[in-house]
Structure formats: C-alpha cells, structure tokens
Curated annotation (Swiss-Prot):
<dbReference type="InterPro" id="IPR000971">
    <property type="entry name" value="Globin"/>
</dbReference>
<feature type="binding site" description="distal binding residue">
    <location>
        <position position="58"/>
    </location>
    <ligand>
        <name>heme b</name>
    </ligand>
</feature>
<dbReference type="GO" id="GO:0005833">
    <property type="term" value="C:hemoglobin complex"/>
</dbReference>
<dbReference type="GO" id="GO:0031838">
    <property type="term" value="C:haptoglobin-hemoglobin complex"/>
</dbReference>
<dbReference type="GO" id="GO:0042744">
    <property type="term" value="P:hydrogen peroxide catabolic process"/>
</dbReference>
<comment type="function">
    <text>Involved in oxygen transport from the lung to the various peripheral tissues.</text>
</comment>
<dbReference type="Pfam" id="PF00042">
    <property type="entry name" value="Globin"/>
</dbReference>
<dbReference type="GO" id="GO:0005344">
    <property type="term" value="F:oxygen carrier activity"/>
</dbReference>
<dbReference type="GO" id="GO:0043177">
    <property type="term" value="F:organic acid binding"/>
</dbReference>
<dbReference type="InterPro" id="IPR002338">
    <property type="entry name" value="Hemoglobin_a-typ"/>
</dbReference>
<keyword id="KW-0408">Iron</keyword>
<dbReference type="InterPro" id="IPR012292">
    <property type="entry name" value="Globin/Proto"/>
</dbReference>
<keyword id="KW-0479">Metal-binding</keyword>
<feature type="binding site" description="proximal binding residue">
    <location>
        <position position="87"/>
    </location>
    <ligand>
        <name>heme b</name>
    </ligand>
</feature>
<dbReference type="GO" id="GO:0020037">
    <property type="term" value="F:heme binding"/>
</dbReference>
<keyword id="KW-0561">Oxygen transport</keyword>
<keyword id="KW-0349">Heme</keyword>
C-alpha cells in the first residue's frame, strides 16, 4: 500500500488540514454535488446550498473520519469498520461515491495547500484515499 515516505507526506500534509476540517469537508461535498449531481440523491433531507449548516456539519464528520484514517493508516479496516457498516448496511451508499468524494477532497487539498501539494503528495493521497475507499466498500462484498 503506502511506503514510509508516503505515510510521512500524508501526515505532514494533514497537519495543514487540522483546524479546517469543517471548511475543507464542506468544500469537498459542495464540489462533489456540483461535479457529480447524482450524489445528491443520498442527501434528500439536506439543504444543499452553499455554506449550509448541514453540509458544513457532514463535511466536518467526513474529514474527521479521514483524520482517524490518517492516524490509523496501518490498520484501516479496523479503524473504519463502523463507518463501513453504516454506509453498506444502513445508508446503502453506492461505493463508487467514495471515489468521487476522494477526488473532490484532493482538489480541495490542492487548492488550499497550493505549492505544498506536490506531485509526490498527490500520489500519496491518491493511494491513501483509494485504500480508504476500498475499506469502506469491503462490507459490500
């Protein structure tokens, strides 16, 4: 999966996310809804307008969960087990949506980290978020 250097890049970049979880999460969700409007079907009860309290709250939950994954990179299955159960059995979210949100989150990182979002950081986050998406989709099999 990730080598030592990639893990260090992820952890270092994550330090820039801390304190901005709600903003980054809301921005990623707003991007996902704009670029992939079919994802809105999973949020029929949400106010999907820019800067809505519901999007901000859920965005913070998403990015907080990613922070847990960053802290437990070597054991993602255990760290994300409850979240995987929730999305597979209760919410029944199509697993392709994890990849869509991952892509949008990477765009948010690139915008906010600017020059610090190097190609190496991009590759590391691409691999990391693909692993997170795969773990979240494990219960669908």
């Amino acid at each position: 999966m990730l080598n030592h250097d990639e893990k260090q890049l992820i952890k270092h970049a994550w330090e820039k996310v801390l304190g901005h979880q709600e903003d980054f999460g809301a921005e990623a969700l707003e991007r996902m809804f704009a670029v992939y409007p079919q994802t809105k079907t999973y949020f029929p009860h949400f106010d999907l307008h820019h800067d809505s309290e519901q999007i901000r709250h859920h965005g913070k939950k998403v990015v907080t969960a990613l922070g847990d994954a960053v802290r437990h990179m070597d054991n993602l299955s255990e760290a994300l087990s409850e979240l995987s159960n929730l999305h597979a059995y209760n919410l029944r979210v199509d697993p392709v949506n994890f990849k869509l949100l991952s892509h949008c989150f990477q765009v948010v990182l690139a915008v906010h980290l600017a020059d610090e979002y190097t190609p190496q950081v991009h590759v590391a986050y691409d691999k990391f978020l693909a692993a997170v998406s795969a773990v979240l989709a494990e219960k669908y099999r």
